[in-house]
Curated annotation (Swiss-Prot):
Gene Ontology MF: a single term: zinc ion binding
Family: Belongs to the SEC23/SEC24 family. SEC23 subfamily.
Quaternary assembly: The COPII coat is composed of at least 5 proteins: the SEC23/24 complex, the SEC13/31 complex, and the protein SAR1.
Domain of life: Eukaryota
Gene3D superfamilies: beta-sandwich domain of Sec23/24, Sec23/Sec24 helical domain, Severin, von Willebrand factor, type A domain, Zn-finger domain of Sec23/24
Entry's localization field: Cytoplasm; Cytoplasmic vesicle, COPII-coated vesicle membrane; Endoplasmic reticulum membrane; Golgi apparatus membrane
Keyword Manganese: no
Entry protein name: Protein transport protein SEC23
Origin species: Eremothecium gossypii (strain ATCC 10895 / CBS 109.51 / FGSC 9923 / NRRL Y-1056) (Yeast)
Length: 756
């Protein structure tokens, strides 16, 4: 079964491609029925049509016409496979024949360009922390100015700068630099803001809106078309200087991040509610002023660690989380995205602010400085364009999932927020964001993937055949979004999965171990946000044992007889590396780093997620062609170069002998051209990996005995540790971690002896 083909055609990948016939049977499978779906996946020869979708008229259905529908050409009627309702086709389908079918009856994924125009161009609201050092601020200014050239000319732009106070810049005033200054230690309400900026009391009913004319006193004067104010905005940015507020010795700068974000979200709510908008926050340190304070301004107060948060010793953590979660709800409800870019060695408070990005589809990027290539290139890649020159980012999206009566939705794990709708196909048990069949994504990109979990609705197994046909469960993903070209679009993907009774060999054969590992990892990461890390790892171990007991072949009490089918055999290995990953093992990571890693993991597709769980290792040598090797200490040899891809960083490691030859300069001698090309080969492959990755990975070039070799050794399975030195020529890893071999021995032992 080619699981990747379904992903290429529809952007969807299921853990089980044949579903159990009943809920009881599904529970026995341990790994839930779920899928990873990429709504805006770049699909070759995607069917794009310029008319509105035809929708089923069944009560509570509203599914879209698709290839699984039964069509009666003579009477111009179609039957919905999800609810069974018979519907009349619109008049323009009258000339349809079996030989000439419209795209939506031939393609399981179709994109509709609707006739509803976009009223307002997207808004880009820059929120800039000016407490940065001059060099860091200069690099940031250069990147923002570059980004202006990548925006559509009709895009609306706005600017806030902040330090101890918050400055809202009035771009409509060309003669002088005019700005409104707000206190950084106050949490303003919308009514106060409207009164201060317009001189009018709103009385709870704002007149400002997308159609309101921009005047010198209107609230929307702070957002103007880029083509009219690019010179003024560039001038303002170029003239920005580091905050002049005096910093007493032993103190951090006063930084009102919370107040700046509060004002930005309120201002957009006041005049552009439900209009596509991005708030881009650039932070050069933690918020030190309430609301949203992460740490006090005194340097004697350290930034919170994981241990502080777990033991309830993080003084400002809960209050800051509550504040930023409220802002996240406001932004998500209004259809506004928040991006957070950190450019400093300190933590900025991503752990507290993560909901701002995770609820709105925004970007969370952790870098050491705004002058680094990681920030510069990642920020510019945010504005990447398609072949037609439009931004690949989409705005104001929502995804509704329709299912046939056999399925119910348990929830979604990904960068979205729930929409309160009354739907019949919602399960009482929740995984991730549940209780709904519709989710809002203020921003979408071709990279965004969502984990969706299903419950089998049938409590008892029903007949698996309907006459001569197999029983099928239908799922339809309907994603409505605003395209950067100024059109409203709807992408519809419809899939069908066969349902069979438990024990049927087709169910086991349909198991996609890669998708299953990523889905279970998403559940584990979601649990880890609220549960104790050790409990989450115990839960993962239990599910692995139960799955192996169910699907492995073995004789009771004989570990040597333990066998897994090829499509199950790698699953324990994925779980082993997941247990050791930075997503669950947070030791040695700051809360901000953990938030960043988990944010990236919960947005990527199956392939990239697997690289994060189990990094890839490629070996280069003079004797052999480049080849993938085991992520194991036995792969580290003196005469090879290793290329490690963890998604977050790409590392080239030179073995001891290679490093000595490189130091001796053999590559500069024409006699050793082969050695020179060997050194270049991994660099060329690394460059290919860097081409379209977001965010840009860190690049590390190291060698045996080098200080940065630890980045490789920490990822390797310690086959050869100081406790067990076996293979000659391999590297000893100094760790107390259990090796994959011992992990598998223990797993086999537990399974064959019937333990849990």
């Amino acid at each position: 079964m080619d699981f990747e083909q379904n992903e290429d055609i529809n952007g969807v990948r299921f853990s089980w491609n044949v579903f159990p016939a009943s809920r009881t049977d599904a529970n026995k499978n341990v790994v839930p029925v779920g899928c990873l779906y990429t709504p805006l996946k770049e699909i070759e020869e995607l069917a794009v049509v310029s008319y509105n979708p035809v929708v089923c008229g069944g009560p509570h259905c509203k599914a879209v016409l698709n290839p699984y529908c039964e069509i009666d050409v003579r009477s111009n009627v179609w039957a919905c496979p999800l609810c069974g309702t018979r519907n009349h086709l619109p008049q323009h389908y009258a000339n349809m024949s079996q030989e000439a079918m419209p795209a939506e009856l031939n393609s399981t994924t179709v994109e509709y360009i609707t006739n509803r125009p976009v009223q307002v161009a997207p808004i880009f609201f820059y929120v800039v922390d000016v407490t940065a050092e001059e060099e860091n601020l200069q690099a940031l200014k250069d990147s923002i100015i570059t980004s202006l050239s990548l925006l559509p000319p009709n895009a609306l732009v706005g600017l806030i700068t902040y330090g101890n106070v918050v400055q809202l810049h009035d771009l409509s005033c060309t003669a002088i630099d005019k700005c409104n200054v707000f206190r950084g230690d106050r949490e303003y309400q919308l009514q106060q803001l409207v009164e201060m900026l317009t001189g009018e009391k709103s009385g709870g009913n704002l007149s400002a809106g997308p159609q309101m004319k921009i005047t010198p006193f209107s609230l929307n004067r702070f957002f103007l078309p880029l083509e009219h104010v690019e010179f003024k905005l560039t001038q303002l940015l170029e003239n920005l200087r580091p905050d002049q507020w005096t910093i007493p010795p032993g103190h951090r700068p006063l930084r009102a991040t919370g107040s700046a974000l509060n004002i930005a979200t309120l201002l957009l709510q006041g005049c552009y509610r439900h209009v596509a908008a991005r708030i881009c926050l650039f932070a050069s340190g933690p918020g030190t002023v309430a609301p949203g304070m992460i740490v006090s301004s005194e340097l004697k107060d350290p930034l919170r660690s994981h241990h502080d948060i777990d033991s309830d010793n993080a003084k400002h953590h809960k209050k800051a989380c509550k504040f930023y979660n409220q802002l996240a709800e406001r932004a998500a409800e209004n259809g506004h995205t928040i991006d957070i870019f950190a450019g400093c060695y300190d933590q900025v408070g991503m752990s507290e602010m993560k909901k701002l990005t995770d609820s709105t589809g925004g970007v969370l990027l952790l870098t050491d400085a705004f002058s680094t290539a990681i920030f510069k290139q990642s920020f510019i890649r945010l504005f990447s364009k398609d072949e037609e020159g439009y931004l690949t980012m989409a705005f104001n999206a929502s995804m509704c999932i329709k299912t046939s009566a056999d399925l119910k939705l348990q929830g979604l794990i990904g960068h979205a927020s729930p929409v309160n709708v009354d739907a019949q196909n919602v399960s009482d048990s929740e995984i991730g964001i549940g209780g709904t069949s519709t989710w809002k994504m203020a921003s979408l990109s071709p990279h965004h993937s969502y984990a969706i979990f299903f419950e089998i609705a049938n409590t008892a197994a029903t007949a698996s055949l309907m006459g001569d046909r197999p029983k099928l469960a239908y799922t339809q993903f309907i994603t409505a979004y605003q395209h950067a070209s100024g059109t409203n679009r709807v992408r519809v993907t419809t899939v069908a999965n066969q349902m069979l009774p438990f024990g049927n060999p087709a169910i086991a054969a349909s198991f996609d171990q890669e998708a299953a590992a990523v889905l279970m990892a998403r559940v584990a990461v979601d649990k880890a946000d609220s549960d104790d890390g050790a409990d989450v790892i115990r839960w993962i171990d239990r599910t692995l044992i139960k799955l192996c007991q169910k699907y492995a072949d073995y004789n009771k009490g004989d570990p040597r007889s333990f066998r897994l089918a090829p499509n199950f055999s790698l699953y324990p290995q994925f779980i082993y590396y997941l247990r050791r990953s930075q997503f669950l093992s947070v030791f040695n990571n700051s809360p901000d780093e953990t938030a960043f890693y988990r944010h990236i993991f919960t947005r990527e597709d199956t392939t990239n997620s697997l690289i994060m769980i189990q990094p890839t290792l490629t070996s280069f040598s003079m004797e052999e062609e480049p080849q993938p090797v085991l992520l194991d200490s036995v792969s580290v040899k003196p005469n090879t170069i290793l290329l490690l891809d963890t998604f977050f960083y790409i590392l080239i490691y030179h073995g001891e002998q290679i490093a000595q030859w490189r130091k001796a300069g053999y590559q500069d001698d024409p006699q050793y051209a082969d050695f020179k090309s060997l050194l270049e080969e991994p660099k060329l492959e690394a460059a290919e990996l860097l081409v379209d990755r977001f965010p840009l990975p860190r690049f590390i070039d190291t060698e045996a005995g080098g200080s940065q070799a630890r980045f490789l050794l920490s990822k390797l399975n310690p086959s050869d540790s100081y406790q067990n030195q076996s293979a000659a020529g391999s590297t000893i890893v100094l760790t107390d971690d259990v090796s994959l071999q011992n992990f598998m021995i223990h797993l086999q032992d537990v399974c064959v002896n019937g333990q849990n």
